[in-house]
Amino acid sequence: MAWSESKAWRRGSSNQPFYQALLDDASTAPARNAKRKKVLHPEDMPWEMSRQGLLKHLINEAMNTRMETVDAYMQIIPPGSRSGKHRHLAEECLYVLEGQGYDLHQDCDVEITDTYHWTPQDEVTRFEWEAGDVIYVPPNTIHQHFNASPDKPVRLISVINRIFKACGLNDLEQLDNAPEYDPAVVLNAEIVDGYLRGRVAAAR
């Protein structure tokens, strides 16, 4: 019916102080932020034996730091090993702290209708890198890192924007696990040192 909206919009009795909540959040932010960390020490940075590999989280939204938009972790790849293989919608850059190796990247064709579909392209591109290099991973690219040395570890710093998650775009998919992955392993400095020297056998 024409102009039916002129009456329909009045329906409903629910009241919620959503705008006031925004004002309250803004007014309390300075005091809240004053308690958040601006400097993190190594003992503040948790380890994780993840499906992607051995990680030491440097900045994460769960770590109560002042960083609002970026997550970062250090990845350790033992001699002769590799990371897991995954893809995500957010672009990523990695700084090579130590070691040398290569990446395998595979672009995907994307179709977005009512649902999201991706199909890997046939071509897989290899990128060589060494300490001091920066690796760029484009959005939605399947990628994996390989340590080319049989006796020296690789350490990478990964940085990724967390805003994409707030936009509903946390499309992270693990396609292959790192050889060392074992959910029963609890990492500490001594255990990680064993991986660095190639003394710990991969789980598979």
Annotated model-derived regions:
Residues 95, 108-139:
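Short acidic-glycine-tyrosine-enriched beta hairpin
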Residues 93-95, 136, 144, 151-171:
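A short hydrophobic beta-strand segment most commonly corresponding to one strand
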Residues 64, 84-85, 146-147:
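Beta-strand elements of modular eukaryotic interaction domains
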Residues 1-68, 174-177, 184-204:
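A short, N-terminal "cap"/entry segment at the start of jelly-roll beta-barrel domains
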Residues 72, 82, 91, 124, ...:
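A structural connector/turn signal
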Residues 56-60, 71-88, 104-110, 139-140:
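Conserved short histidine dyad/triad with adjacent acidic residue
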